[in-house]
Amino acid sequence: MVTGSSGGIGLELARQVAARGDRVVAASRQGSAALRKLVAAHPDRVIELALDPGNQESVIAARAGLEGRVDAIDILINNAGVYSRWSRHWDPDATLFDTVTQEELVDTFRINAAGPMLVIEHFLNLVRASPRGRILNVSSRVGSVSAKTSGGDYAYAASKAALNIMTRALAAELAPEGIVVIAITPGWVRTEMGGRAAALSPEESVRGILSVAAKLTPKDAGRFVDYQGEDQPW
């Protein structure tokens, strides 16, 4: 299951999972023409699901809508996110300290930090039903406290740092059940959020993410890695 599947990294994750023959629940807030095209190409492999991780009622409805359609989720990838309340992509004006508002901070946290935890809470029983449940929370190096040496990105960076600490806590809580939880940064990717100057294509990033997911073992619980599996600073 992948959240934020209407475009960018999420859509490419759904595409590559379906292409290798696996079933994927492609969850997104509003869907897209590209996602509908993917569903049409693989109607037996791609399940489109309306889900807004920033809205508890939407998450509850999404879980109810999936009832009876899948028995278990082997890998849950919390990919949905926003750069800021005002824009899904990087915006230099949104990085300045004097432009940050309480409303922006709260809304960014609601989607980027609280959202993944809400999704996990309501879909965890399906992950538990898998003999090899894995949860990947898509984070960012911008959320690394020890690597933060510049100003800016206040709402986005703080929300990803919050996601990181919740990932660590959840990893410790679920490890006794054999469920592996990690935080992963996809790299700087050419998407609507990353922009055209980014170093990686969605295809490259997603190949790496799926490779990392396939190789996870219980000893990896609580790690923060990049799309190549390299440890990242907290």
Pin down the residues of each PLM region.
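Conserved glycine-rich cofactor-binding loop
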Residues: 6-7
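N-terminal Rossmann-fold NAD(P) dinucleotide-binding loop
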Residues: 10-11
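Conserved glycine-rich Rossmann-like NAD(P)H-binding loop of the short-chain dehydrogenase/reductase
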Residues: 18-36
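Rossmann-fold cofactor-recognition segment
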Residues: 41-57
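Conserved Rossmann-fold cofactor-binding substructure of NAD(P)-dependent oxidoreductases
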Residues: 54-70
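Catalytic loop of short-chain dehydrogenase/reductase
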Residues: 82-109, 117-118, 124-176
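C-terminal helical subdomain
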Residues: 176, 183-186, 195-234
